[in-house]
Amino acid sequence: MVIIQQTMLIGIGMIGGTSSEFGLYKKLIPPGRRRMSTLPVVAGKAFVYASIYAVTLFYILGLHYKLFHFPTNGHTADIIAFLIPYLLSCIFLGIAVSTLFQRREQSIMLLLWCSIPALMLSGASVPREAMPEWLYRFGQILPSSSGVEGFIRLQSMGASFSDVLHEVRILWILTIVYGGFAAVGIHLRLKKAAGK
């Protein structure tokens, strides 16, 4: 789950940095209109990234898990229902963060450096019980923290969807918050590209 989040953030960050570097945000502004629409741009980007990562998740969960005989105790419908808010929160976080980069290399330098802390905060390498409570709470701002916790319980332990409702709620809250940040970030980028 951390790998999915970090590759998505780096990839979306590189696209955002490239768009800034080469002035591609101007192409997203509809010609002849004074008012720029932000939500269709954010929704379109989110749909494309979700389509790409749906294929990636199918490979990881459908083929990779079976090929290496990883435990698959969860129900497919529960796992898909869990992955939807996880994927959306990662995508909107990626779009929001991508608006901060002026060049594509900046995303690699920052987000690759953030990968180890994201792994530690997720609870995958350091158990939650070994972390200070404030650090655990801070880690909840990343989708991977709730994603790892819920996914392990669903996939490996065979938990039902109702057992991971707390993580699902956190992921939906992150989706809404990061969706708002993404819309604001894209709006500011489009405004800057329009020269206003």
Regions found by a protein language model. Give the residues of each.
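Transmembrane helix-boundary elements of multi-pass transport/secretion proteins
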Residues: 1-58, 62-75, 160-164, 180-196
